[in-house]
């Protein structure tokens, strides 16, 4: 019997949740936290107005990016150009080049 009373209480709570969910979707209950208007006015085909802080930050991070790119290119250029050294042709053997031995005439 206690299982039935627990089941009935769950059904009651579920019914309340379902009813309150329907009311919220219909707009009858709940709290709206929106301001009601557009927070940022659109500026069609106009440049955004930047603050001095935004300009400073953008120039700082742009300079930092280019410093890092040029520093890495100067000190670790093999990362960009490839890190395998070009082989010295004077060390290649005739067999590697496909040249037959001299005693074969």
UniProtKB/Swiss-Prot annotation:
<keyword id="KW-0472">Membrane</keyword>
<protein>
    <recommendedName>
        <fullName>NADH dehydrogenase [ubiquinone] 1 beta subcomplex subunit 2, mitochondrial</fullName>
    </recommendedName>
</protein>
<keyword id="KW-0813">Transport</keyword>
<dbReference type="GO" id="GO:0009060">
    <property type="term" value="P:aerobic respiration"/>
</dbReference>
<dbReference type="GO" id="GO:0008137">
    <property type="term" value="F:NADH dehydrogenase (ubiquinone) activity"/>
</dbReference>
<feature type="compositionally biased region" description="Acidic residues">
    <location>
        <begin position="93"/>
        <end position="105"/>
    </location>
</feature>
<dbReference type="Pfam" id="PF14813">
    <property type="entry name" value="NADH_B2"/>
</dbReference>
<dbReference type="GO" id="GO:0045271">
    <property type="term" value="C:respiratory chain complex I"/>
</dbReference>
<dbReference type="GO" id="GO:0005739">
    <property type="term" value="C:mitochondrion"/>
</dbReference>
<keyword id="KW-0496">Mitochondrion</keyword>
<comment type="subunit">
    <text>Complex I is composed of 45 different subunits.</text>
</comment>
<keyword id="KW-0809">Transit peptide</keyword>
<keyword id="KW-0679">Respiratory chain</keyword>
<feature type="transit peptide" description="Mitochondrion">
    <location>
        <begin position="1"/>
        <end position="33"/>
    </location>
</feature>
<dbReference type="GO" id="GO:0005743">
    <property type="term" value="C:mitochondrial inner membrane"/>
</dbReference>
<feature type="region of interest" description="Disordered">
    <location>
        <begin position="85"/>
        <end position="105"/>
    </location>
</feature>
<dbReference type="GO" id="GO:0032981">
    <property type="term" value="P:mitochondrial respiratory chain complex I assembly"/>
</dbReference>
<comment type="similarity">
    <text>Belongs to the complex I NDUFB2 subunit family.</text>
</comment>
<dbReference type="GO" id="GO:0042776">
    <property type="term" value="P:proton motive force-driven mitochondrial ATP synthesis"/>
</dbReference>
<dbReference type="GO" id="GO:0006120">
    <property type="term" value="P:mitochondrial electron transport, NADH to ubiquinone"/>
</dbReference>
<keyword id="KW-0999">Mitochondrion inner membrane</keyword>
<dbReference type="InterPro" id="IPR026627">
    <property type="entry name" value="NDUFB2_animal"/>
</dbReference>
<keyword id="KW-0249">Electron transport</keyword>
<comment type="function">
    <text>Accessory subunit of the mitochondrial membrane respiratory chain NADH dehydrogenase (Complex I), that is believed not to be involved in catalysis. Complex I functions in the transfer of electrons from NADH to the respiratory chain. The immediate electron acceptor for the enzyme is believed to be ubiquinone.</text>
</comment>
